[in-house]
A protein has these predicted regions:
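Solvent-exposed soluble domains appended to multi-pass membrane proteins
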Residues: 1-259
Length: 259
C-alpha cells in the first residue's frame, strides 16, 4: 500500500482538480480506478487508522495514539501475519511521529524503516528524505523480499507533499512560482510514484505483487461550517500484473480497503 500524503482529488484533474498528477492519470488506465473514494478525516493519522485497521474515526485522538490500542489491535499486518506474511512500514521521515512506530511494531508489523536507514539520500528536507529516496528504498526492499520467497506486506508513506513542500530541483517542470507550493510538491510526488512503478514493472516482484495507491486525506479543512464533502474526495488505484483496467463508480471510503 502506497499512502500518499495530502494527495486528494484537489490535485487530480480527472476528479475535478488541478492538473498536477499526470502519472496518476496514466496509471489509472492500467488498473482499478476508484472515482468516488473518500477519506475518513483530514489528518495523516486518520488515514493511517482507516487504511491499516479499517477502524472508524474516534473522537479527539486516533486509535494510533490511544493507549488501549498499543497492542493486540487488529491491523492488516496482524491479519496477514496469521497467514505467514512479514510486514514492514517504510517512511522517509521520523517514524516516531504520531506514534506510528510504536503502534505498528506492537500490532503486527515486523519492521519499520525510517529516515535513519537511508545512506546518502538524494535529498533531505524538513520532513526527511525525498519521495524518490523513499521509493528507491521500497524497490530495494521488495527485491530483497522477492528473493526470500516468503509473502510480505509493505506500507509505504510519502512525505514530500507536506509543508514546507521541499523537494529536489530539476525533476519536474514547475506548475507555478515560487517552487515550494503544494501544487509543485504534488507534481514531484506524482513524478516519483511514476518512476517507481516504471522500475517495478521491470522487476521480478511485479508479477506477484498487488499495489494499492491511496491518499491519506485531501488538503486541510478548517472552520465551523457544513462539512465540505468534496474536500474528503481522494484518488484510489489498484495496480498489478494481472489486474485488468476497471473504473469503479461505487461510493467507498478508506475503511473499505482492509477486511
Amino acid at each position: 500500500i502506497i499512502l500518499e500524503e495530502s494527495l486528494g482529488a484537489t490535485f487530480v484533474e480527472s476528479l475535478g482538480g488541478t492538473p498536477v498528477t499526470p502519472e496518476i492519470e496514466k496509471l489509472k488506465k492500467q488498473g482499478w480506478w476508484f472515482e468516488q473514494l473518500y477519506a475518513t478525516g483530514t489528518r495523516s493519522v486518520r488515514g493511517i487508522e482507516a487504511v491499516v485497521t479499517g477502524f472508524p474515526p474516534t473522537p479527539a485522538q486516533s486509535t494510533v495514539k490511544l493507549s488501549l490500542a498499543q497492542r493486540n489491535f487488529s491491523t492488516l499486518a496482524a491479519i496477514l501475519g496469521q497467514q505467514g506474511y512479514e510486514s514492514e512500514f517504510i517512511y522517509g521521515g521520523e517514524s516516531h511521529f504520531d506514534n506510528m512506530r510504536s503502534f505498528f511494531l506492537a500490532n503486527g508489523f515486523n519492521r519499520v524503516t525510517d529516515e535513519n536507514d537511508y545512506v546518502s539520500p538524494v535529498f533531505r528536507g524538513s520532513w526527511g528524505v525525498s519521495d524518490e529516496d523513499l521509493f528507491n528504498k521500497t524497490h530495494e526492499r521488495l527485491v530483497e523480499k522477492q528473493k526470500t520467497g516468503k509473502p510480505s506486506f509493505t506500507l509505504v508513506f510519502t512525505s514530500s507533499n507536506h509543508a514546507p513542500f521541499e523537494f529536489p530541483d530539476g525533476r519536474i517542470s514547475l506548475y507555478e512560482q515560487p517552487k515550494n507550493t503544494d501544487n509543485n510538491a504534488v507534481k514531484y510526488t506524482d513524478y516519483a510514484l511514476g518512476k517507481f512503478v516504471e522500475k517495478a514493472k521491470t522487476s521480478d516482484y511485479w508479477k506477484n505483487t498487488v499495489f494499492v495507491v491511496v491518499a491519506d486525506h485531501d488538503i486541510r479543512v478548517r472552520g465551523d461550517s457544513l462539512v465540505p464533502i468534496e474536500r474528503f474526495h481522494i484518488p484510489g488505484l489498484i495496480l498489478g500484473a494481472d489486474i485488468k483496467p476497471r473504473v469503479i463508480k461505487t461510493v467507498a471510503s478508506q475503511l473499505d480497503l482492509p477486511p
